[in-house]
């Protein structure tokens, strides 16, 4: 009897994994299509950052570091679009879990880790869209820099946006209901101003901004161009300061996400 039950367990596990693989691919494809068909979401994630680049950066060929001002603005707007994308997708995933979709997923052979991996992959794919569009517009309209500037800044913008997937998850786990995603996106706009993404800051506002979540990420994305020097002779940010900002906020967001998840589980 023991041998039969052990054999059944051993054969069930591989079968479950085999079922989970095509299910994971199917779910990932469906989720990506759903994100791309969300016209309002795509507007704020892709079209709005591109429009802001048209307004603030196109055609400004004044030299800035190893590039020009147009490229500096291009990187900033791509960063804004990327973090908006990862925040939106991750926030939606957290909301789905709290609204009961998590129970439906739990009934399928799809493991929790696979669900998280799918949502992360979809978030990063969506984040690549505003980066690709804005960089293409920049290349066609006079943004100039060397090959390293283009490749390094794009890579940092894309990879660094993953931090804000954790942020979106944290906010939507801490706050209740469908409005949580709106709160997360609204805070991104405020943090973008303080993070020197929309307009160069100076004085006390700049000093406050150095401690906000987007400051380190944006500074690192523009570091290949600026080497840490700020516009309007507002000072210099060493790379260790920018890295410390990103690491500190990553830990804070992760801690908030864990706390929010535990609190919700305790209420169930």
Where do the protein language model's features map onto the residues?
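Short, contiguous pre-domain boundary segments
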Residues: 2-18
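Alpha-helical transmembrane segments and their short interhelical loops
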Residues: 112, 116-182, 189, 239-243, ...
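Juxtamembrane membrane-interface segments at transmembrane alpha-helix termini
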Residues: 84-89, 162-169, 194-201, 219-225
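Hydrophobic alpha-helical interface/terminus motif in multipass membrane transporters
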Residues: 56-59, 93, 102-105, 137, ...
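Short hydrophobic, aromatic-rich alpha-helical segments embedded in or entering the lipid bilayer
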Residues: 2-6, 22-26, 197-235, 239-240
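Transmembrane helix segments
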Residues: 55-63, 172-215
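Transmembrane helix-boundary elements of multi-pass transport/secretion proteins
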Residues: 16-19, 23, 27-99, 119, ...
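Short helix-to-coil transition segments within interhelical loops
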Residues: 104-112
């Amino acid at each position: 009897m023991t041998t039969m039950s052990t054999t059944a367990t051993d054969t069930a596990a591989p079968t479950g994994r085999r079922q989970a693989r095509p299910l994971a691919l199917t779910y990932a494809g469906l989720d990506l299509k759903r994100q791309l068909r969300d016209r309002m979401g795509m507007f704020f994630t892709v079209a709005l950052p591109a429009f802001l680049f048209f307004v603030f950066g196109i055609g400004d060929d004044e030299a800035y570091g190893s590039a020009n001002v147009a490229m500096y603005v291009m990187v900033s707007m791509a960063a804004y679009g990327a973090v908006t994308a990862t925040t939106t997708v991750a926030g939606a995933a957290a909301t789905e879990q709290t609204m009961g979709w998590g129970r439906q997923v739990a009934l399928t052979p799809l493991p929790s880790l696979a669900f998280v991996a799918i949502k992360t992959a979809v978030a990063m794919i969506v984040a690549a869209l505003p980066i690709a569009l804005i960089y293409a517009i920049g290349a066609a309209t006079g943004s100039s820099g060397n090959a390293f500037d283009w490749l390094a800044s794009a890579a940092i913008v894309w990879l660094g946006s993953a931090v804000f997937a954790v942020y979106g998850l944290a906010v939507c786990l801490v706050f209740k209901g469908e409005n949580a995603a709106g709160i997360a996106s609204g805070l991104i706009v405020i943090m973008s101003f303080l993070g020197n993404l929309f307009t160069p800051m100076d004085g006390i506002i700049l000093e406050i901004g150095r401690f906000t979540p987007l400051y380190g990420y944006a500074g690192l994305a523009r570091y290949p161009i600026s080497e840490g020097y700020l516009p309007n002779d507002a000072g210099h940010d060493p790379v260790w300061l920018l890295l410390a900002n990103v690491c500190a906020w990553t830990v804070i967001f992760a801690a908030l996400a864990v706390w929010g998840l535990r609190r919700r589980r305790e209420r169930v």
